[in-house]
Amino acid sequence: MADHYVDQLAKLQPMLATQMGVFGFDGQWGEHNPSGWQDISMLLTRTLSQIQELPPSGRHWETLGRRVLKDHLSGRLESIELGDPLRDLNNIASPIQLFRETFDLMPKASVDNWEAIASRLGSLDGAINGYIESLSEGRRRGLTSARRQVEVCIDQCCVNAGPGSYFEQLSGNASNAEVPDTLRVEVDKGITIARSAYQCLADHLQNEYLPDSVEADGVG
């Protein structure tokens, strides 16, 4: 059951799949909009129901495994129900950083690896647009992050969008690898899209999100 849950979660959250080392989803992002989070919520609810329907087990480790999985699922479901993904913005570990850091985790040894990288670069704008939709829904509900967090995130987005960013280094890595010229062109096109997507995110945070952000710093 746990393996099936991980497989289904990987399909819904390919970025998380890369972080977990689950192969087969490295060219995808998944849905980062409110609809995507609703799909994850349904998966969590469905898996929790399946655990409840299991017959009692007399084996210690099986009972413990069920309890651990149930606690994990319940915690994630509660987080979604509270709207946490709709205000998931901070300067250390939020989609703003994870979109970029995902490329660090992707293998770069083969043509297939670079095809996945090119695919993700070229579709990063869609993932970021979905993330903006979630943040906008959070604003509508009155769920926003602290102003200082937003300001730092704007700076981070501008760095990723600007000259000398990580994405330009990625272009150099592709040039040094044994990658066909046509694929290098796709990587460079994707880099342009990725940098532009981060600039759009910076503009959105500056012009739309920041005015509604919370003055008090989040603590605890």
List each language-model region with its residue ranges.
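N-terminal maturation segment of proteins
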Residues: 1-220
